[in-house]
From Swiss-Prot:
GO terms for biological process: chemotaxis. One of its GO terms (cellular component) is extracellular region. Belongs to the MCD family. Crabrolin subfamily. It is found in: Secreted. This is Vespid chemotactic peptide T. The modification Leucine amide is found at residue 13. Mast cell degranulating peptide. Induces the chemotaxis of neutrophils. Its mast cell degranulation activity may be related to the activation of G-protein coupled receptors in mast cells as well as interaction with other proteins located in cell endosomal membranes in the mast cells. Its main location: secreted. Expressed by the venom gland. It comes from Vespa tropica. It comes from the Eukaryota. The lineage of its organism: Eukaryota, Metazoa, Ecdysozoa, Arthropoda, Hexapoda.
Length: 13
């Protein structure tokens, strides 16, 4: 899992 995607998901959550 890419940290970039995690950052995006974290922003949405």
């Amino acid at each position: 899992f890419l940290p970039i995607l995690g950052k995006i998901l974290g922003g949405l959550l």
